[in-house]
UniProtKB/Swiss-Prot annotation:
Gene this protein is translated from: PNPO
Modified residues (Phosphoserine): 241
Effect annotated for changing residue 229 to W: In PNPOD; strong activity decrease
Name used for this protein in its record: Pyridoxine-5'-phosphate oxidase
Cofactors (names): FMN
Length: 261
């Protein structure tokens, strides 16, 4: 592997040398050019055409791609996703978490309402999800409004989790500052003893959300960077309103188009 830095060319005989050299450079505050880091995706014969859509309902199309991701032995957590939220004054934040269900009504996930994402969703109830399945060269982006799930549903899911995870949710006042990890260990041990023979109560600050999709984009990578992008959006045109020549009707109120990469 060869990498170019400002004024420096470094060649590595073994991939294992790369992380160590990166650490060395970071310690010296070197400016790093990662331009040469590149991988091949799919060829043109494997392009994602409109005729390859499993359904003209994007949630069903997501289900088809999700099933392929689940079956792929190189993907450990097909339901891992990046959740992006934003404050009312436009400061974004993003983090990885797990999708816990999806359907026509939306995409479900659970978290602590007092976390940064919880506070941002409370003040600005819109979000974006991104699923990236690298071995398949595929990505799905979902945008839409978010609302809290009913308390009964949150309660049901909470008690379906392993008891250690339930206790962990009680221990952690997510995003609050703590003295050290030992603090968490002690709190966890105390609660393990307290709830050894009884049910763990769900914290009031813990629950679920559902994101109602208004935009869903399906991306598939191409080696020549002419990536495939097919986007679905809920349409404003109603009835027999004419559509543009490059806009197509999907199922129900969905419209879809191909975007330039």
């Amino acid at each position: 592997m060869t990498c170019w830095l400002r004024g420096v060319t470094a060649t590595f005989g073994r991939p294992a040398e790369w992380p160590g050299y990166l650490s060395h450079l970071c310690g010296r505050s070197a400016a790093m050019d990662l331009g040469p880091m590149r991988k091949s995706y799919r060829g043109d014969r494997e392009a994602f055409e409109e005729t390859h859509l499993t359904s003209l309902d994007p949630v069903k199309q997501f289900a088809a791609w999700f099933e392929e991701a689940v079956q792929c032995p190189d993907i450990g957590e097909a339901n891992a996703m990046c959740l992006a939220t934003c404050t009312r004054d436009g400061k974004p934040s993003a983090r990885m978490l797990l999708l816990k269900g999806f359907g026509k009504d939306g995409f479900r996930f659970f978290t602590n309402f007092e976390s940064r994402k919880g506070k941002e969703l409370d003040s600005n109830p819109f979000a974006s999800l991104v699923f990236y399945w690298e071995p398949l060269n595929r990505q799905v982006r979902v945008e839409g409004p978010v609302k809290k799930l009913p308390e009964e549903e949150a309660e049901c899911y909470f008690h379906s989790r392993p008891k250690s995870s339930q206790i962990g949710a009680v221990v952690s006042h997510q995003s609050s500052v703590i003295p050290d990890r030992e603090y968490l260990r002690k709190k966890n041990e105390e609660l393990e003893q307290l709830y050894q023979d009884q049910e763990v109560p769900k914290p009031k600050s813990w629950g679920g959300y559902v994101l109602y999709p208004q935009v869903m984009e399906f991306w598939q990578g191409q080696t020549n960077r002419l990536h495939d992008r097919i986007v679905f959006r809920r349409g404003l045109p109603t009835g027999d309103s004419p559509l543009g020549p490059m806009t197509h009707r999907g199922e129900e109120d969905w419209l879809y188009e191909r975007l330039a990469p």
